């Protein structure tokens, strides 16, 4: 617990029993016991130092790639969206960005400042922090090949600068020092033409809109692609395109997307995920691994 004096000294916004459905791209999820929007990096550090070290923590950006169960999260959510989003050009090829910066914003900023190589980030519906945590990718690009260094913070508020060799990077997974979260990154890009970079972003977003159910509540891609294949192909081949459970549905437009068609519950989405996994494994002997992270308790 935090002392009243410590709370008064914080500059961010502290909410209690905040419904997480309002903060996730699937529009589902029960309440967080505490929900904190830090004013800035210094405020975040002060908050972490004042927090009980045993308090469960969940870091939340745009709320994509995340399924919060209906019972909510029995701890503290730290929401970086619109808060830790500082961006700056550094030198001839460098770009510095805080973890709460939306990937699409980062891609546009890089293009505007004549840096190329980050255009694919425009197709990732999350923040840089989330992209770093899972090595997010789109249209053939991945996050970590751009990384020169990262800054992390632990639950005690200690900030560190780490190089990529401190992490094990894989396909849609990243393993690093335990108990640390991404605070910012230094990216290395190439000098280039703003007009060409903007045109590439426009083209990628048009491809995304043509192939994916943009505008409908989803988490983005639900499953990782298995080696040598595509999750969407396997799901469609199993006859699961359009499969429904309550208001949760496998998208008719892209089978690797599960959408909330109205008032789906997290339990329905989770059950549909497991149904898809079971049927694909039964038909093809392939166990699909989820990209989405499931957190919280199942029932209130």
Enumerate the predicted regions with their spans.
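Glycine/threonine-rich beta-strand-loop-alpha-helix active-site module
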Residues: 115-120, 125-164
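Residues embedded in well-ordered beta-strands within globular domains across many folds
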Residues: 88, 119, 151, 292-293
